[in-house]
């Protein structure tokens, strides 16, 4: 509770601070991350008009603390023993621009030469290690500076040093809890941001207003599939003509009906032949054991019986 109350008090104090000396920073932020992505801005046409020239934006110390980028880097390296190495510097848009709701804020590491160092010590629970690198900012047009993407851009694909975690905290005018503590800059200072030099898995910066759409990584499975496909093409071709002709004949109803009818007729003929052979064999066996009188050779003509002589004793 005490920590939350302290944060609220610091945020309220930050809202009452007045801007100090303006600072000029040359903007060199990749244009693909400056796309509105759904933000309807009258000053932004959205058409691809080619590479846009670099613009120079004047940055002033915060007056409202609503249009800020907050990038918090948490290193995995051993934490330093001194807490004086951390201070917070927030960069905002020019005072004449109005913030938009839901805009993310970036928290960058800066030199510990500000008037709110003591307050930051109280609000910070653990020290952080800062790497001093000059911040480069780039805005395609002056209209883009009025949108939510005009400040420091952090790449969503992991453009942070290894071991550092990136946290984005959206802020709104009605949500002061997520706003950073107030820091009053006494003069021109160089912003220090933890940035990673490597830009792997990023599409090249496109011309116009297009934002980087997607980043695809080629996996081993896709490569394996691509290697298998040529093997399938190198196989010997099948005679599609003969196969298609045979399948076409079988698919025709009249041909299929003729084949079935011929098979049935052949089966009936074979059964009749076997039955006839069995019948002949049976009749032959019956004739060999017959007791009937043999037929006469003359065709059945009448013959006078022979007279038998009797002998008496």
Swiss-Prot record:
First and last residue of the signal peptide: 1-22
Bias type Basic and acidic residues, positions: 97-129, 286-295
List the biased-composition ranges (Low complexity). Answer: 135-154
> Which GO CC terms are listed, alphabetically?
cell surface; external side of plasma membrane; extracellular region; plasma membrane; protein-containing complex
* Record localization: Membrane; Secreted; Secreted, Extracellular exosome
GO MF, one term, reads:
cargo receptor activity
Q: Which residues lie on this side of the membrane: Extracellular?
A: 23-257
Protein origin, superkingdom? Eukaryota
SMART domains membership = 4.1m
Which protein family is named in the record? Belongs to the syndecan proteoglycan family.
Q: What does this protein do?
A: Cell surface proteoglycan that contains both heparan sulfate and chondroitin sulfate and that links the cytoskeleton to the interstitial matrix. Regulates exosome biogenesis in concert with SDCBP and PDCD6IP. Able to induce its own expression in dental mesenchymal cells and also in the neighboring dental epithelial cells via an MSX1-mediated pathway.
For this entry, the protein name equals: Syndecan-1
State the species of origin: Rattus norvegicus (Rat)
